[in-house]
């Protein structure tokens, strides 16, 4: 399974912190990040439009908004340092940009964990045509 995740990351495109974010998600939720969160609702995955469909989709919406606020580096390629401590994630990078990216990912992974009870498989592979309305960051 681990090999499949690494191969999938390579096929999607090499993105520095994508693997780090995936590890955070797995550690916090015990779910496969690729199959469970890469194409969920209107905001989990690349792009996003419309209104978030549930609490998990809102986690992705907030994550997208967080990335939009990151300055001085590309949040999709910036690698950062972090650790797992006492059931949580601790961002440890001193570089302000990398730390901001880590915080975006930490908050999202924690949000996924906190909303596991409302995760709904019907939002996997959700059709973009169903994503209507607008939501502001």
UniProtKB/Swiss-Prot annotation:
Expressed by the venom gland. Its EC number is 3.1.1.4. The keyword Iron does not apply. One of its GO terms (cellular component) is extracellular region. Residues 1-16 form the signal peptide. It comes from the Eukaryota. InterPro entries: PLipase_A2, PLipase_A2_Asp_AS, PLipase_A2_dom, PLipase_A2_dom_sf, PLipase_A2_His_AS. Exhibits high hydrolytic activities and shows strong preference for the anionic micelles (dPPC with deoxycholate) to the zwitterionic micelles (dPPC with Triton X-100). PLA2 catalyzes the calcium-dependent hydrolysis of the 2-acyl groups in 3-sn-phosphoglycerides. This is Basic phospholipase A2 Drk-b2. It comes from Daboia russelii (Russel's viper).
């Amino acid at each position: 399974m681990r090999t499949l995740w690494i191969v999938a990351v390579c096929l999607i495109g090499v993105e520095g912190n994508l693997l780090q974010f995936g590890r955070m998600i797995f550690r916090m939720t015990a779910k496969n990040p690729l199959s469970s969160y890469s194409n969920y609702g209107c905001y989990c995955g690349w792009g996003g439009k419309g209104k978030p469909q549930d609490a998990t989709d809102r986690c992705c919406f907030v994550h997208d908004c967080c990335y939009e606020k990151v300055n001085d580096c590309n949040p999709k390629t910036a690698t950062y340092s972090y650790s797992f401590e006492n059931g949580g994630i601790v961002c440890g990078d001193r570089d302000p940009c990398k730390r901001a990216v880590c915080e975006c990912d930490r908050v999202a992974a924690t949000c996924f964990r906190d909303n596991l009870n409302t995760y709904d498989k019907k939002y996997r592979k959700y059709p973009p045509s169903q994503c209507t309305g607008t939501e502001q960051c």
